[in-house]
C-alpha cells in the first residue's frame, strides 16, 4: 500500500496493529516529502525529527527501511516486494513547488477561514 508521510503520521496505530498481527502479505511504502502536500505544503512531523521507519521498528515490524537515493531504491526493491512482512519502506523525496499547489497556510489561518465559512463574519467578534 502507498501512503504519504502525513497520512501515515495520522494513522500510526495501524503500524502497531500490522506488527502485532504479523500481517505477512503487507508492504507499506511511505512517500515522505516531509510536508502535508494536500493542504498547502505545511511542514509535517517527518520533517521535524519523527522517523517513520524507526516508529515501524519500535512497533515490531520485522523489516523497515529508509530509502534516500535511486541507487538505494534499486538495492531495496526485492526486499520491499518480496520481504517477509509486514514490511515498511520510507522513500524520501524532494518536493518542488507545483504551480497548481495551494499556497502554504498555517493552522490558525485555516481555522479562521473555516469558522468564517461556517458562522460568517460574526465568528470573529
Predicted regions and their residues:
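Thiamine diphosphate
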Residues: 1-34
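Short, well-ordered secondary-structure micro-motifs
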Residues: 12-14, 38-42, 76-77, 99-102
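Active-site pocket-lining segment
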Residues: 32-41, 57
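Glycine/aspartate-rich loop-and-adjacent alpha/beta segment that forms the canonical ThDP
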Residues: 83-125
